[in-house]
């Protein structure tokens, strides 16, 4: 009969017991035979390995950081305008180029620029993080957007409406919150949070959600209960994923 020892089955030979009309009278003998077999070396009764409890979640992981996010309901969208976050694509890092061109230059391949060295004229996004496909970028008729991982409207409804203008400008131009992505996928996302939209490219979901957690932690934005549950579900599939860091300061000038 098989016995489990240190997680593996070991076999012990037991003389078979065949039922007969004398079954009742032989039951004590069968019981004795079984007990003797179990007493043989290597046949002792041992428990299998106990289920291993999950280890502690690292505070440096995206999953650990999710636990620290404040949970509240979504505030009204009343008063939201894109202009509340400043003019689009400022030069917050003072390198002479707008944020959009900085992100394009960093995240596209085969980049060509105009004579001033700032404007990105063409390039290739391969792979596109949201779909996993290949997207060509040509300035003026682009199929590539620069997406805010945490949408401006979502931020507005979860704390940003109480920020200073300077902090909102920093948020809108922070590279930590920006990714070049397929325009069609980005527009399907809209201002959705993790509970309502995830990239079709499943391989990117951990990176995507970890980025959202990092941004919300950095800027002190809250999450809804459904959003936190969705974040946790994704990040449990990659519990060691580190929380992204860096980006720009949380205050920015007006140009």
Feature annotation, model-predicted:
Residues 40-42:
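C-terminal motif of bacterial Sec signal peptides marking the signal peptidase cleavage site
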Residues 44-47:
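Bacterial signal peptide processing site
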Residues 49-84:
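N-terminal low-complexity, Pro/Thr/Ser-rich intrinsically disordered segments
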């Amino acid at each position: 009969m098989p016995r489990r020892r240190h997680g593996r089955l070991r076999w012990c030979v037991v003389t078979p017991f065949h039922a007969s009309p004398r079954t009742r009278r032989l039951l004590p003998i069968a019981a004795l035979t079984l007990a003797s077999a179990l007493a043989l070396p290597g046949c002792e009764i041992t428990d299998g390995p106990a289920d291993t409890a999950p280890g502690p979640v690292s505070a440096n992981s995206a999953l650990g950081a999710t636990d620290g996010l404040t949970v509240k309901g979504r505030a009204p969208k009343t008063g939201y305008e894109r202009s509340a976050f400043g003019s689009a694509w400022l030069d917050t890092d003072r390198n002479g180029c707008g944020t959009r061109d900085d992100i394009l230059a960093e995240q596209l391949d085969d980049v060509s620029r105009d004579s001033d060295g700032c404007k990105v004229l063409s390039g290739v996004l391969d792979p596109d993080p949201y779909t996993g496909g290949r997207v060509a970028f040509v300035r003026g008729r682009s199929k590539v957007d620069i997406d805010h991982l945490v949408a401006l409207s979502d931020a507005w409804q979860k704390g940003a409406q109480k920020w200073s203008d300077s902090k909102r400008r920093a948020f809108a131009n922070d590279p930590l919150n920006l990714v070049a992505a397929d325009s069609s996928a980005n527009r399907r996302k809209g201002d959705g949070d993790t509970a309502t939209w995830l990239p079709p490219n499943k391989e990117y979901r951990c990176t995507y959600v970890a980025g959202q957690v990092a941004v919300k932690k950095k800027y002190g934005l809250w999450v809804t209960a459904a959003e936190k549950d969705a974040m946790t579900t994704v990040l449990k599939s990659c519990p060691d994923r580190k929380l992204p860091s860096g980006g720009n300061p949380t205050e920015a000038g007006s140009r």
